[in-house]
Structure formats: structure tokens, C-alpha cells
A protein has these predicted regions:
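Beta-strand/loop substructures that line and gate deep hydrophobic ligand-binding cavities in soluble
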Residues: 125-184
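Residue-identity detector for glycine
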Residues: 12, 17-18, 29, 45, ...
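Hydrophobic ligand-binding cavity/cleft-lining segments
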Residues: 38, 42-93
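Hydrophobic pocket/interface hotspot
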Residues: 71-76, 82, 100, 113, ...
Length: 184
């Protein structure tokens, strides 16, 4: 669903094979009432969350943008801007009956951002034709002289290593494009 590039700082999935991991009983800063079955594993910037027998692998991709975080958030949070910076997701975005739809290379999906907020949270949800909902964590973080956009690519069930890497590379390309658009 995304296209490819190399300018984003990536802490990508290590090559297939053995992975050295350490496990903590709960995530840093977890609240006391968090379910005990939640476990986090950290390895080379990659997270694996075990939750009730299900495992989700994540790859955090970031791009530094020389623009204030509120400007980056304002631009990136408008679904109509997606084709300009995230054509890997889709080149056509349409609003219908208060909902946003994007035509991906494989199908038309419903797209929704988390409610507007002052924290830079740009999490979004893609609802596939099958009814499956894909949660995509994304943040715009302010720093001293600009911002950093962090996008979490999550491995979906059945996704091969090559597909997972291609998805991450495509996100990196889109974040690099977002940087170019906003720094022009």
C-alpha cells in the first residue's frame, strides 16, 4: 500500500534469523491496572507486543522536518493532502457522507484520523472491504527547531519479511516526500 525511499531514519527489521530480545513485564510508564498478559519486547528499535496469545511486530520510522510541529500536524492531518505526500497509500482521496475514502493500489478503503488534538497524535484507521480495521500509529513530535514525524508500521498476520520491509520502505518514502513538501 505504500511506495519506497531511503532518506528517513529507520530502525528497521533486522535480517531474518536470530533476534536478541529482552522482555519487560510491562511497558515503561504503564499504569498499575494494565492487564498482566501484556508484554513488550524491544530489539533494535523494533517492538513486539504479546497480547493474549497474539503477536504484533512494529517498525518505527521517523523523519525530521524543519517546520514547527503544529504546521506539520495541520498539513498532514488533512486527508485531502494525502495524495501530495503519501501516494503510496493512494492517489485518489474522496469525502462522502462525512467519511474519507482512499483508492489504494488494491482496493478502496475508508480512512479516519484520530480526533484533532494538541498532542500531535495522527493515528489513523483504515477499514478494508473485508471489514478488517488496520490501526496505524503516527505522531508529530516537536523539537527545538522543528519536528519529527514517527510512523509505526505494524506487521499484519501473514505478511512476509519482504512485504513488511517493502511496507516500511514505502512509508519512509512517503515521510521523505512529506518533508520535501513542507520544507519547500
Amino acid at each position: 500500500m505504500w511506495t519506497s525511499a531511503a532518506s528517513a531514519r529507520m530502525r528497521g527489521p533486522p535480517a531474518s534469523g536470530g533476534i536478541q530480545c529482552t522482555e519487560a513485564s510491562t511497558a515503561p510508564g504503564a499504569v498499575a491496572d494494565e492487564p498482566e498478559h501484556v508484554r513488550f519486547v524491544q530489539s533494535w528499535g523494533r517492538s513486539i507486543q504479546h497480547d493474549g496469545g497474539m503477536t504484533s511486530e512494529s517498525w518505527h520510522i521517523s523523519e525530521r522536518i524543519d517546520r514547527p510541529a503544529d504546521e506539520v500536524y495541520a498539513y498532514a492531518s488533512i486527508p485531502a493532502n494525502l495524495p501530495r505526500w503519501a501516494p503510496g497509500l493512494g492517489n485518489s482521496v474522496e469525502e462522502a457522507d462525512g467519511q474519507w475514502f482512499v483508492d489504494t493500489p488494491t482496493e478502496r478503503v475508508r480512512f479516519a484520523f484520530a480526533p484533532r488534538n494538541d498532542l500531535g497524535v495522527l493515528d489513523h484507521y483504515l477499514t478494508l472491504n473485508s471489514g478488517e480495521v488496520i490501526y496505524v500509529p503516527m505522531r508529530v513530535i516537536a523539537d527545538e527547531s522543528g519536528s519529527e514525524v514517527v510512523f509505526t508500521v505494524r506487521r499484519r498476520p501473514g505478511m512476509t519479511d519482504d512485504e513488511f520491509k517493502a511496507d516500511g520502505d514505502a512509508v519512509a518514502a512517503d515521510l521523505a516526500r512529506l518533508k520535501r513538501v513542507l520544507e519547500e
